[in-house]
């Protein structure tokens, strides 16, 4: 990847809103160049201030864990998506441990805040993300802040 390009992997358990988040982030800023399906790798890119961000979304189902490993190769940053209505699950913890074991810097987006909440201090008690942003991907809440945080950490 070129110097002014970064790879961001969007990762999380099943049905947390990864694809919706990617679609709305990219629709909000730029044009989606390609959209995959959830059983494969979702992809979209956008350019902000001469920096091209390549977003790769991983499937959340357990049977596709191997695809997470593939997607994480050569990544600059990961975005972990949590579902506020479910709280922090065992699978969420496993994903974060995977990123930390690979020394991949990551941020957290707590999604679906319209139907639940996760206390950020609870998250910071077990992991060390670069940032935590709360919002609702469907309503596009928190996406401007999220893009700004991603830009400042990549």
UniProtKB/Swiss-Prot annotation:
InterPro entries with a match to the protein in the record: Gliding_Motility_GTPase, P-loop_NTPase, Small_GTP-bd, Small_GTPase_MJ1339, T_Tr_GTP-bd_dom
Record-listed GTP binding positions: 12-19
Family of the protein in this entry: To M.thermoautotrophicum MTH765.
Occurrences of domain G (ranges): 17-112
Record's keyword terms, sorted: GTP-binding, Nucleotide-binding
CDD domains: Ras_like_GTPase
Organism, as annotated: Methanocaldococcus jannaschii (strain ATCC 43067 / DSM 2661 / JAL-1 / JCM 10045 / NBRC 100440) (Methanococcus jannaschii)
Classification via Gene3D superfamilies: P-loop containing nucleotide triphosphate hydrolases
SUPFAM superfamilies cross-referenced by the UniProt entry: P-loop containing nucleoside triphosphate hydrolases (SSF52540)
GO MF, any single term: GTP binding
Protein name in the entry: Uncharacterized protein MJ1339
